[in-house]
A protein has these predicted regions:
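N-terminal flexible/basic segments that precede or flank functional cores
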Residues: 1-32
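DNA major-groove recognition helix of helix-turn-helix
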Residues: 62
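Short alpha-helical DNA-recognition segment
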Residues: 42-57
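DNA major-groove recognition helix of helix-turn-helix/homeodomain DNA-binding modules
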Residues: 71-87
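Short amphipathic helical patch at the helix-1/turn junction of helix-turn-helix
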Residues: 37-39
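Short, charged recognition helix plus adjacent turn
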Residues: 89-93
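Generic structural marker for isolated residues within well-ordered, non-membrane alpha-helices
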Residues: 33, 44, 74
């Protein structure tokens, strides 16, 4: 058994570095959206109207079903919520 260390859980469980990076970005966005909804005490129905999605879709978001959301969808919802997204790109070590 190897004692390999990973910088992120996504590095450990995803098959490729590309998939891991995608999941890292998606998890940051999903968490930001969940925090926004919790902080504003907005109902799922209200959020659905703002995000332009269905209430069950917001429920999936709140339950952390990350596999159901692509980057585009999460970016669109965050922007609709008035959140500003910044991205930083670094060269691999």
């Amino acid at each position: 058994m190897s004692n390999q260390r990973f910088a992120s859980v996504w590095d450990a469980i995803e098959d490729t570095p590309e998939e891991a990076e995608n999941m890292k970005l998606r998890s940051v966005l999903l968490t930001a959206l969940k925090n926004y909804l919790t902080r504003t005490e907005m109902s799922q129905a209200q959020a659905a109207k703002i995000f332009g999605v269905t209430q069950p879709r917001v429920s999936d978001l709140m339950r952390g079903k990350i596999n159901l959301f692509g980057l585009d969808a999460l970016v669109n919802m965050a922007t609709a919520a008035g959140l500003h997204i910044e991205m930083r790109v670094l060269e691999a070590a």
